[in-house]
Amino acid sequence: MNESFAEALAARTQDVLDNCTRCGRCFEVCPMTAPAGIAGKNAADVVGGVLDIIRGGSGSPASERWAQVCSGSGSCIPACPEAVNPRFMLALARVAMQRRASAEEQHKKGSAAFSKMGRGVRVLSRLQLPAGVLKRFRSEGPAETPPEVVFYTGCNVLKTPHIVLLALDILDALGVSYRVMGGPGDCCGVLQFRSGDLDASGRIAYHTTDRFAATGAGKVLAWCPTCTIQIGENVLPGRTGTPGAPAYDLEAFVVYLASQLDRLRPLMRHPVMKRVGLHEHPGVAGVCESAIRILQAIPGLQYVELAQPQVGYMCNTLQPLPAFKREVHRGILEAAAAAKVDALAGVYHACHRELCSHEADWPFEVVNFLELIGEAMGIRREDRFKRLKKMQDADAILVEVMDLVELHGLALEEVRAVIEKDLLGEQPLPLRSARVDRDAASAPG
């Protein structure tokens, strides 16, 4: 195990155990307890069970359930009177549960998850862009002078590369010097952390954060909320006061962009005459508020507030409760339709992958909010992921992307598997049109 990471995690774990008073306030404000069916449990007992799990005990079924369904909403953090981070506490509990398995099983599980993610990123990005454009996603070689910021993509946003291109276009227009880092080679280590393989997780995370420091940038702008939380809460606090302590600030890209609104506003010269609602997740503090501020600054755009549950930091964090996740998706689509929006805008890539194909069934477009900023600036990047996913036919998609398959030398069997699993397979709420097609096919002739 990476001893520095292990020691830091052990010390921070002890701080949680020492400082948590089991008041239960974090459990009481958690938005996931009702969907998980544990809202009526004694809060102090559930929290006490979580602490027992962290110590290596069995806890209780309710405590395990609470840890497993945590979606990282973050409402627990300001609620704690002892300044314990309950989101970190629940992450420690999940790690403790994973570490009941053998070290071999932990490593195998983490490696499998990493390989699956890497394959999806590699293939889907290449099915949308030629090699020359993909080079923009990873800065190579030393810079002559330190950049102002590192733009840290994380990994999975590269499956929807138009989002990354828009972010870089906006930074270019603002005149910000940056270095792009991300992809599996600069992973945050979260997949290994989730499997309990702390050796691999620490090694990967420390490699990436050391590379951030080597750029000399004073700020790292993280796109992905998973990376923001993994690095910002699980990794960097343990490096404080050590030789590896960061000399940079980690900030969510969207929050940074809102801080540059005075510079951004004059660049948004083209009216965007649309009613727009925002698909929100509260997990990373300030992101939704920042996105709304920016949308409200776009000329011609009418921002419409949509009723929606404040849960998770991205849609994929709701996966432990699939029925609840489907209801959340159905609810936001219905709210957008009721508000008569022209566009339902999301912030994050995972949400976009799961929701974008619903555009075929509803009277509004589903976009990333950066597309609206780009439109106001006269910048357009085609959302090829959405175009392909709306086809809903693996054979038709293969025909559409065959030129890029050949250009990148991809194996057809692998491409088909990724299309079926990673492109079409991520559909928590079935399309209404798909249900109609199924019903028609099964109707008696």
Residue ranges and their predicted role:
Residues 249-261:
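Catalytic core of nucleotide-activated saccharide and alditol-phosphate transferases
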Residues 1-28, 32, 98-102, 144-147, ...:
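Iron-sulfur (Fe-S) cluster-binding modules
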Residues 17-35, 67-84, 153-156, 184-196, ...:
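Local cysteine-cluster metal-coordination motifs and their immediate loop/turn environment
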Residues 190-191, 260-263, 314-318, 376-379:
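Short, solvent-exposed polar/charged micro-motifs at secondary-structure junctions
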Residues 14-17, 41, 47-230, 234-238, ...:
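Iron-sulfur-cluster electron-transfer modules
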Residues 21, 41, 45, 162, ...:
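Conserved active-site and cofactor/substrate-binding residues in soluble primary-metabolism enzymes
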